[in-house]
């Protein structure tokens, strides 16, 4: 498995990027899911956002566990960078699907 300069391997990074793109493309279904739990939060959008990020993060951790890899600080920081680099896409997708 080829490793990028720090953190997440190239293969795992590609997998996570593709997974995140999938969830962005499915934002409408997460908005619908959030409608079911709207009574627990003032913002259904925040619920949908949290579900997307939480699901991708859970998959990130499970991928490492399946490969018997230790999650290191560099890996977590790179994961957070991946999410930060896609915040606008996630937000835009959630906003588009609520109109």
Enumerate the language-model features and the residues they cover.
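Short terminal alpha-helical segments
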Residues: 1-36
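Short, surface-exposed loop/turn segments at secondary-structure junctions
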Residues: 2, 38-43, 66-76
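Generic alpha-helical structural element
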Residues: 5-8, 45, 49
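Charged, amphipathic alpha-helical oligomerization/scaffolding segments
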Residues: 22, 55, 82-85
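Short, flexible helical or helix-coil boundary motifs
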Residues: 23-27, 31-34, 60-63, 67, ...
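Acidic, low-complexity, intrinsically disordered interaction modules
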Residues: 46-65
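Amphipathic alpha-helical binding modules
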Residues: 69-99
């Amino acid at each position: 498995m080829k490793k990028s300069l720090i953190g997440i391997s190239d293969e795992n990074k590609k997998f996570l990027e593709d997974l995140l793109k999938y969830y962005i493309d499915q934002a409408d279904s997460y908005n619908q899911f959030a409608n079911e739990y709207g009574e627990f939060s003032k913002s259904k959008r925040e619920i949908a956002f949290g579900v997307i990020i939480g699901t991708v993060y859970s998959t990130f951790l499970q991928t490492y566990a399946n490969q018997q890899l230790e999650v290191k600080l560099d890996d977590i920081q790179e994961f957070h960078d991946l999410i930060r680099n896609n915040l606008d896409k996630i937000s835009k997708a959630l906003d588009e699907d609520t109109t």
